[in-house]
Amino acid sequence: MRFWWVNHKQTHLQEIEGGYIWSPKNNRNGSRNQTYINLTKTTPGDIVYSYADGHIKAIGVVERHCSGMPKPAEFGRTGDYWSNDGWLVYLNWKKLQNPFRPKNHLDILGPLLPEKYSPLQKNGNGNQGCYLASIDSELHDALIEITEASGNTIFLKDSEENRLREEEVEESKISELSIQETEKVQLIKSRRG
């Protein structure tokens, strides 16, 4: 599982409501943009943080692999200068009850930001040239702590990691039952389908 941070001030309303993120495949001048290419590196179960208007507003779980897709019609005139040829990744977004400003937590987050393709500038403002940034597990852990400390309940049960963890807990409970080993194996097999 990988972790990502999307800067999408212009399109976050459409993308959160629509359950996706979208970017053009290239910059306006035709050059490659690593933060657009990053959409192709996402896999189901990956976690994505939504950043817009200076706040982390939602957390999403990637549902499907990236696919080539024209610019969504619901963008309207937003991004008129973007190419119509783009990448789309479907996500299951969960809006935060209490969005928070990463800039207010720069003492914690600053040292954890990636050196290259950082989603934030050193002053804590969003990096306008960065769309989808890869972040490491340390930054993810810090974001989760801040999200929870801000009064949010986090449900990422859609992720593969959480599904596997839940299965392990259930299998552990079955293993502790005082029944024959063959019955335990059958129960575990029936849970897996």
Feature names for model-found ranges:
Residues 1-12, 26-33, 71-190:
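Contiguous surface segments at macromolecular interaction interfaces
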Residues 34-38:
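A structural connector/turn signal
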Residues 56-67:
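Short beta-strand-centered aromatic/proline hotspots
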